[in-house]
Amino acid sequence: MFNMNVDESASGALGSSAIPVHPTPASVRLFEILQGKYAYVQGQTIYANLRNPGVFSRQVFTHLFKRAISHCTYDDVLHDWNKFEACIQKRWPSDDSCASRFRESTFESWSTTMKLTVRDLLTTNIYRVLHSRSVLSYERYVDWICATGMVPAVKKPITQELHSKIKSLRDRCVCRELGHERTIRSIGTELYEATREIIESLNSTFIPQFTEVTIEYLPRSDEYVAYYCGRRIRLHVLFPPAIFAGTVTFDSPVQRLYQNIFMCYRTLEHAKICQLLNTAPLKAIVGHGGRDMYKDILAHLEQNSQRKDPKKELLNLLVKLSENKTISGVTDVVEEFITDASNNLVDRNRLFGQPGETAAQGLKKKVSNTVVKCLTDQINEQFDQINGLEKERELYLKKIRSMESQLQASLGPGGNNPAASAPAAVAAEAASVDILTGSTASAIEKLFNSPSASLGARVSGHNESILNSFVSQYIPPSREMTKDLTELWESELFNTFKLTPVVDNQGQRLYVRYSSDTISILLGPFTYLVAELSPVELVTDVYATLGIVEIIDELYRSSRLAIYIEDLGRKYCPASATGGDHGIRQAPSARGDAEPDHAKSKPARDPPPGAGS
């Protein structure tokens, strides 16, 4: 699963004292927790907001828009305005060219067109950058930070395909179809340069998956090293872990939540097992009893004894006596037994003519005095022997089942050699049924086939009777633990990254947004350390939640281009005539002598300070 192939030179550099940091069973589980494998609760959904790259996209958009629109001079804007005004004067009669409403309309048309053109140029090309596929992944960066506090980064060269895309981007940014407007050309050229830098930076750095990196700690040099595909790569240790006695404890949110997450997960697993075991609700306690044991003895004697077996006859007598609850019934049974037995005896008194009691009377007396006691002792002995045999039988059956389970586990699925079937056994284990997510029938079958658990449901067997029955539906409560884990996730993420919740009028949280501290803690290292975008300014928390259209309006309103256009408007279309006409152009002579002195007193058209910058 993990790509840990380090070349010989690299492994020699590690030395025998290197402590493995990742991948280890503990570190891998941290990433699996982020992927929702263990006890995914509602509070973990905040993490989805945290790793959303929307804030970074707004930061790139703000940087490109602000840098491009600020790369214009007052001379370029003035040149474009003069060119536009000259075209308007050619199209309209000269008598109307100096009318106040006409001047306002002309300037408003030009300023609005300039704004739309610049906005169209910038947004179209910036969107292509934001929505194009880049190698650098902000989501993986957040995963590494939240799991380990360290971020590996791989430098890679720019591909030829990317060079071709950058070249085509230059043609779109220069905007040849817009004519010879200096302002647009300056903005487009600067947009291309800024975009090229962003694209090259985002595609020259790669953050690998957690399954592709090996991280180790070197105690001798007190440094962490990372390897990717056999070669050493950069490793940004933002939050160093604690290492004690060879055990690594990361300084990360998921590491702090680890124990609580697995406590909740094991409780859910326990609840699922109880649910499966209690699918059949009727349970019974089964024990040994001798109430109907005589039937088994009679069946045994019937199969193994002779046709006329005295033990069988006497046992039948005892059975009949036990089934009769009245004195008359017992008397009838004894009389019947004596009659049957006396027919097979020789009456010596009748044969030799001796007086005294008859044979039937003597037999009756004998039965009443001694036979019953002897037979009872013998039957008790038989019962003890049968009970011992039954217990011995159950013991051997358990041993046979255990041996069969061990033999089946040691052999392969098809009964093959363990060495030959090792890959198949590993594959079967990997594809085993998950108790939490598997089907109920498969999970029950897995539980009852487990050799380590004596779980089963059976009907009472020989010499067993139901002593008590009850309904068992116990399932461990897990809702409270899940709720506590949700609150713990929220508290950890909010306090670690200083997130700001956004709530509605009812106080329900809609989503979370980046605060200024979040941008400094999370977005700052990604921008300057990982992506190496040193010219990019960190976005403010206000822009982090605004829409793109709102960001465009704010950036344009405070841009250099908007200030220059506003200054031209004040001079060309003054608010009142008392303040003097600070128009850019001289009033046409066709107006007559209505304002000769005023026209002559116009100031020189000097650009404002910093106009050439």
Swiss-Prot record:
Any Pfam family matching the protein: Herpes_UL6
Top-level taxon of the source organism: Viruses
Chief location of this protein within or outside the cell: virion
Region Disordered: start-end pairs: 577-613
GO-annotated biological processes: chromosome organization
Cellular-component GO terms for this entry: host cell nucleus; virion component
Compositionally biased residues, Basic and acidic residues: 592-605
Location of the protein in the cell: Virion; Host nucleus
Role this protein plays: Forms a portal in the viral capsid through which viral DNA is translocated during DNA packaging. Assembles as a dodecamer at a single fivefold axe of the T=16 icosahedric capsid. Binds to the molecular motor that translocates the viral DNA, termed terminase.
Protein family: Belongs to the herpesviridae portal protein family.
Subunit structure: Homododecamerizes. Interacts with terminase subunits TRM1 and TRM3.
Protein name: Portal protein
